[in-house]
Curated annotation (Swiss-Prot):
This is CinA-like protein. Pfam families: CinA, CinA_KH, MoCF_biosynth. CDD domains: cinA. Belongs to the CinA family. InterPro entries: CinA (IPR050101), CinA-like_C (IPR036653), CinA_C (IPR008136), CinA_KH (IPR041424), Competence-induced_CinA (IPR008135), MoaB/Mog-like_dom_sf (IPR036425), MoaB/Mog_dom (IPR001453). SMART domains: MoCF_biosynth.
């Protein structure tokens, strides 16, 4: 079963708002075995909408449309539905009663004609009652395709998807099973991971597809199995995950879709009952921010010193001015001193330190733009690594932040493994 999601609104096309509706709808459809064939964003233009509907007719099983259901002149979806289905707008008594109660009872103001117009729906549609707002959803079928119209307001759309659309599709359509399994890897790029697992990937059964989802510092491998026998799919996924683990066990750190590196590091620290602190210069507290963003971080994250200026490194962290004069503020030696000193100050098992030149100009540093030194103080000594993350500034900061957590993760995994 295939679906297309259509978002209507000029505000999306000019970048004024971000379309989060399609993301939510696609996830909900995937959960019940409906494949999202495509996502389309179009303008508030009746002819454009009609052309889109005609193109999608019989191409997919379900077209879910969001937006354009408001009471103003630029909201044209209902009238367009009427034209496409050769129908007319009529007042739905239940919707009118709901709108009246909401406006007069809840908001305590007289109902206007624009409010009343929200109760106008195509006479042939199945009304999807919207308890969260005034605009009802609409369900209409033409030949082999169902067209569903939903309000664009996210919380109203979510209510109708969860309480009307999904239950109705489940009841009326037979669908295949879709099973996903996500493998989280850290520390190696997409091409290297692909090279390592090439033979394994080539031997996957036809009903299992593999997708590479790279992010800075990590690659997610998402396996998707589709078929009619759920037990067969689950067994095949599990067997292939086990064989994959035997190949890249050294870089697999989890199996949850949305698990981030800060979450993985947090779990490792908590499991080992270890603590961490940070001393940051070029990353400006971003490493600390990621660590602190995880629920329960207080169990292992003790604090941070953002020593952006040289005087902060000297006066707060206690880094020797002589050391800075000898090696420069952007150096392995200064990074190591920062890590050791914050580890001692906050009495943690591990400490991360960053110092570098993120650009856009060299400033007081002689280091090339993009140069970053990352130090990790451990119970057994200090590890320092030099990187050049290039440009622009934002990229340098983000990559240095992720790399810092990668280094910590690898060091902890040496103990765990």
């Amino acid at each position: 079963m295939k679906a297309t999601i259509v978002t209507i609104g000029d505000e999306i096309l000019i970048g004024q708002i971000v379309d989060t509706n399609s993301n939510f709808i696609a996830k909900e459809l995937d959960r019940i075995g409906v494949e999202t064939y495509e996502m389309i964003s179009i303008s508030d233009d009746k002819q454009h909408i009609l052309n889109t509907f005609a193109q999608l007719q019989n191409k997919v099983d379900v077209v879910i449309v969001t937006g354009g259901l408001g009471p103003t002149k630029d909201d044209v979806t209902k009238k367009t539905f009427c034209e496409y289905f050769d129908d007319e707008l009529v007042v739905n008594p239940e919707v009118l009663a709901h709108v009246t109660e909401l406006i007069e009872g809840f908001y305590k103001r007289p109902i206007s004609q624009l409010n009343k117009d929200q109760a106008l729906v195509p006479s042939k549609c199945t009304v999807l009652h919207n308890k969260m707002g005034t605009a009802p959803g609409m369900w209409m079928k033409k030949e082999n395709t169902v067209f569903v119209s939903l309000p664009g307001v996210p919380y109203e759309m979510k209510y109708l998807v969860e309480n009307e659309i999904i239950p109705k599709i489940v009841k009326e359509y037979k669908r295949p099973y879709i099973i996903h399994k996500t493998i989280l890897t850290y520390g190696q790029g997409e091409s290297l991971v692909a090279e390592r697992i090439e033979n394994w990937e080539n031997n996957l059964p036809e009903f299992i597809k593999l997708a590479y989802l790279p992010n800075p510092g990590r690659v997610r491998l998402r396996m998707t199995a589709r078929g009619t026998d759920k037990e067969v799919l689950e067994k095949a996924i599990e067997e292939n995950v086990q064989s994959l683990d035997a190949i890249i066990h050294d870089i697999i750190v989890g199996y949850e879709e949305n698990e981030t590196i800060e979450t993985v590091v947090g779990k490792l620290l908590a499991k080992q009952n270890k603590t961490v602190s940070t001393a940051e210069s070029c990353t400006g507290g971003k490493v600390a921010s990621l660590l602190a963003s995880v629920q329960g971080a207080s169990a292992y994250f003790k604090g941070s010193v953002v020593s952006y200026a040289t005087e902060a490194k000297v006066n707060v962290l206690g880094v020797s001015q002589d050391l800075i004069d000898q090696f420069s503020v952007v150096s392995a030696e200064v990074a190591a001193a920062m890590a050791l000193n914050v580890k001692n100050i906050l009495k943690t098992d591990y400490a991360i330190a960053t110092t570098g030149n993120a650009g856009p100009s060299k400033g007081d540093s002689e280091a090339e733009i993009g140069t970053v030194f990352i130090a990790l103080a451990t119970p057994n000594g200090v590890i320092t690594e030099e990187f050049n993350f290039g440009q622009p500034r934002e990229k340098v900061i983000d990559r240095a932040t992720i790399k810092s957590l990668e280094i910590l993760q690898k060091e902890i995994l040496k103990i765990v493994q």
